[in-house]
């Protein structure tokens, strides 16, 4: 091997080590700040004055979903990108379980914010019938129903996710399912919740004007 090739290889290895260290420490910082923020949110939304506030219940549920997502996904990410260790690459159970937890909880965090926007829309409505739907009782039913529907909606993950490819990777089965999964993420997580939040926020502003 020539000296120039050896130098290039050393530079590549150095860059890889730097990249791994940045990933590890960046993810650790992100994890600490994310969990700290979520814990503060949980502390605020569990105060006595907010315990029966439906909007606060939705925010608390969103924060809880975010916390579960962080606790499950971030350790795997640190192991994967920082140490090249990822049990989802060779343990099918880990593969299916991790993504069946992270995808629904990530989506739930957004959908609970949608419910909070809908609650504000109902609360600000001049129609007394609409205002009655903004209540602790409605929220106590809506939250578990939403959790159930989202996890049912993502039931295809443990069915169609598998380990394939060289090198092995945990992903959806190639072919039609990959296409479906792309559209599913766009609608259920990428564009659906933000669009509904925008719509109900605009409608709420119209109510309070």
What function would you assign to each model-found segment?
Residues 2-14, 80-105, 131-133, 137, ...:
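Loop architecture of class A 7-transmembrane GPCRs
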Residues 16-28, 55-115, 123, 127-130:
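Extracellular TM2-ECL1-early TM3 structural module of rhodopsin-like
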Residues 32, 61-64, 101, 145-148, ...:
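Hydrophobic residues within alpha-helical transmembrane segments
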Residues 33-36, 112-125, 158-164, 186-209:
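Class A (rhodopsin-like) GPCR signature focused on the TM5-ICL3 interface and adjacent 7TM helical core
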Residues 34, 38-44, 66, 70-73, ...:
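Helical transmembrane-bundle signal
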